[in-house]
Amino acid sequence: MLLEQIWGFLTAHPISVVTTILIVYLIHITLKPLNRVRRLGDVGLFFGKPELKGFYRERQLERLKLLRRVGDMPPVFPNGWYCVCESEKLANNQIMEITVLGQFLSLIRSESGAVYITDSYCPHIGANFNIGGRVVRDNCIQCPFHGWIFSAETGKCVEVPYDEGRIPEQAKVTTWPCIERNNNIYLWYHCDGAEPEWEIPEITEITDGFWHLGGRTEHEVMCHIQEIPENGADIAHLNYLHKSAPPVTKGSDIIKTDLSDPQPAVQHVWDGKWEVKSEEDRHCGVMHLNQFMTFWGYKVPLTSSKLVAEQHGPGIVHMLFDFGIWGKGVVFQTVTPEEALLQRVRFRIFSNIPWFFVKFFMTVEAMQFERDVFIWSNKKYIKSPLLVKNDGPIQKHRRWFSQFYTENSPKMLKDGSLSNQAKSIFDW
């Protein structure tokens, strides 16, 4: 009887039902935090007109990698901390495969919630912990092939289940230093085996629960890692590449956007500077940026923002925002070198800013970032650029960034291979 009444209502009021469903759906997607993910080839690369699809697209991507002129590049894996996972993506008692520094590793969360990173291959006969391995005894991992058990903390084998004899001394898996900070998990890498040389600052507003996750974006970018943070010192490009407002023009696609328009209808106006934080914190570079929007040359009220972006080493940026009456927050930009010329870039915002403003801000930020992706994915690295007076402190930034390269930093050879493989500081 009830089903008949429901069916009768649906058939009698189809427009009302469809409208209600549409409204509920729109509310859902509006309130849902932004999760914008772009894989390699989704943005930044040109696949012809008409655009290539499927197999032909993949083949063209391989050709682009092969034929692109990369230039005289610095080493490909600088020393520092790298984000390998967002905290909420790793559950207790889980082993997760991660890609970083040109290799697969195993990210582990124990039953009690601690995080560890180890090499992925069992030293017994070489099985992969990521494929069928499991967490046991709180903080140990068990190989899926023969059941050998290793401490995720020390890497040592603690049990061979079918043999009661003495465990071989060399039965050990390599571990990597890691830390969980600001709802991200980071790995420490140093090509000379040095212990962590600085700490990642803790944002107390996140720890104390005053700021909450409001959205994220993730991009795969085909370039050298140094190209991305160098943007912070390249002040001149802001008022050209990022001048027009993406939602009003052609979004992120610079092929379809007339960047030479001297007076876009809606325009971002930028002003900033970059400098080394201090001699004591020489691993940290700071960019101060002021921005507002104009409409036909007139400043738009309530669009002003001030940004202090602190870059901690080669792969972490903390962007501290003050939006005035809208509130405050931080955007984490993390750059992780998965391969020599493949970076995974994540943006995550934590704030007390209203949800609708956060979603708008992160969407515009992503579109602006994707304009840079078009440049990075197709440019070559020039060791000695031809700079003019108002280009900004690009050379100063390069001298600062060079501290993260040392004698054993892996270099990309002419055939595309690496001079040496990245390894844990515990392998020295």
Curated annotation (Swiss-Prot):
This enzyme catalyses:
cholesterol + NADPH + O2 + H(+) = 7-dehydrocholesterol + NADP(+) + 2 H2O; cholesterol + NADH + O2 + H(+) = 7-dehydrocholesterol + NAD(+) + 2 H2O
Note the effect listed for C122A.
Abrogates cholesterol dehydrogenase activity
Kindly list the organism's lineage.
Eukaryota, Metazoa, Ecdysozoa, Nematoda, Chromadorea
* Entry's Gene Ontology molecular function annotations: 2 iron, 2 sulfur cluster binding; cholesterol 7-desaturase (NAD(P)H) activity; metal ion binding; oxidoreductase activity
E.C. designation(s): 1.14.19.21
As for what it does, the entry says:
Catalyzes the production of 7-dehydrocholesterol (7-DHC or cholesta-5,7-dien-3beta-ol) by inserting a double bond (desaturating) at the C7-C8 single bond of cholesterol. This reaction is the first step in the synthesis of the steroid hormone Delta(7)-dafachronic acid (one of the principal steroid hormones in nematodes). Dafachronic acids bind directly to the nuclear hormone receptor (NHR) daf-12, suppressing dauer formation and inducing reproductive growth.
- Where is [2Fe-2S] cluster bound in this sequence? C122, H124, C143, H146
Instruction: State the InterPro entries in the record.
Output: Cholesterol_7-desaturase, KshA-like_C, Rieske_2Fe-2S, Rieske_2Fe-2S_sf
- One GO-annotated biological process of the protein: cholesterol metabolic process
Domain called Rieske: residue spans: 81-187
Top enzyme class: oxidoreductase
Which family is annotated? Belongs to the cholesterol 7-desaturase family.
Cofactors demanded by this protein = [2Fe-2S] cluster
Native species: Caenorhabditis elegans
Spans traversing the lipid bilayer: 6-26
Q: What is this protein called?
A: Cholesterol 7-desaturase
Gene Ontology annotations for the cellular component aspect, listed alphabetically? cytoplasm; membrane
The record's listing under Pfam families reads: KshA_C (PF19298), Rieske (PF00355)
- Recite the UniProt cofactor note for this protein: Binds 1 [2Fe-2S] cluster per subunit.
Metabolic or biological pathway, per its Swiss-Prot or TrEMBL entry: Steroid hormone biosynthesis; dafachronic acid biosynthesis
Name the gene. daf-36
The cross-references to Gene3D superfamilies, in alphabetical order and at most eight, read: Naphthalene 1,2-dioxygenase Alpha Subunit, Chain A, domain 1, Rieske [2Fe-2S] iron-sulphur domain
Q: Where does tissue-level expression of this protein occur?
A: Expressed in intestine at all postembryonic stages, including dauer. Expression is reduced in daf-2 mutants.
Membrane topology of this protein: Single-pass membrane protein
Keywords assigned by UniProt, alphabetized: 2Fe-2S, Cholesterol metabolism, Iron, Iron-sulfur, Lipid metabolism, Membrane, Metal-binding, NADP, Oxidoreductase, Steroid metabolism, Sterol metabolism, Transmembrane, Transmembrane helix
